[in-house]
Amino acid sequence: MMENFKHTTVLLDEAVNGLNIRPDGIYIDGTFGRGGHSRLILSQLGEEGRLLAIDRDPQAIAVAQTINDPRFSIIHGPFSALADYVAERELTGKIDGILLDLGVSSPQLDDAERGFSFMRDGPLDMRMDPTRGQSAAEWLQTAEEADIAWVLKTFGEERFAKRIAHAIVERNREQPMTRTKELAEVVAAATPVKDKFKHPATRTFQAVRIWVNSELEEIEQALKSSLSVLASGGRLSIISFHSLEDRIVKRFMREQSRGPQVPAGLPMTEAQLKKLGGRELRALGKLMPGEKEVAENPRARSSVLRIAERTNA
């Protein structure tokens, strides 16, 4: 059954404007979600334009399949494989723009059955594609305490990671957790100092979700693939929602905008320097939501949009 959860696309106009749409261009929306960005891109394309959308969430695919437009196609899979999708269509080096809206979507958070939120009781799942891989419950039941602590510290920046990991393992030993409410209660009980502005399970849920979905590895692979996929002058327009995501995007754009780094004083001929190649991208800056958007959609508060352009290198 199709859910009917509201989803407000964050930085909608800004992210699409960042692509610098050409009517006859070929674009990728790597995170279709509920189609906000895709529909706006399609509205700016001419008859010769094309849009390839990607999502690993079956519910997003169901929404995408309602779009009856010959310029549009949808792929069920991870955006980390975008280079493969493009190669299969013989479009490598011909893509004029890639848009990524990272992290979990509002419909995923709001649907208790998906298991993403500690605010709503549901199955402890957290998979963006429930047809593949381990659920959060399965992973927490089989993982070593030290591994759980590492995930909470690394992906949740949780200062009580060891204490929480121990509590999770002890609880699963007594009776395996299968519900989001159970995990939230265990984390809250194991957290000695409470933040009055944030639920104690916030960081744990973020960390487990990122781990279960390999989110940061997905981002790194997609960014790396973008260099071979984009045409000269093609744009990257990427929205991040937390510091771990934004750090990866920022570092990638900065490094690819600098070009190869040669140690000072190292003697190199012009031919050798040319062989190293020039910079791959030109960073065009970042944007953040305005006060009005944040007031209308509080989830936009932490979002950051970064834009870069493929060079001739």
From Swiss-Prot:
RNA-binding recorded as keyword: no
Function summary: Specifically methylates the N4 position of cytidine in position 1402 (C1402) of 16S rRNA.
Keywords noted in UniProt: Cytoplasm, Methyltransferase, rRNA processing, S-adenosyl-L-methionine, Transferase
Disulfide bond residue pairs: none
Name the record gives this protein: Ribosomal RNA small subunit methyltransferase H
Highest taxon above the source species: Bacteria
Location within or outside the cell: Cytoplasm
NCBIfam families named in the record: 16S rRNA (cytosine(1402)-N(4))-methyltransferase RsmH
Catalytic function, reaction form: cytidine(1402) in 16S rRNA + S-adenosyl-L-methionine = N(4)-methylcytidine(1402) in 16S rRNA + S-adenosyl-L-homocysteine + H(+)
Swiss-Prot/TrEMBL GO biological process terms: rRNA base methylation
Recorded GO MF terms: rRNA (cytosine-N4-)-methyltransferase activity
Family as reported in the entry's similarity comment: Belongs to the methyltransferase superfamily. RsmH family.
Pfam families the record matches: Methyltransf_5
Annotated organism of origin: Salmonella typhi
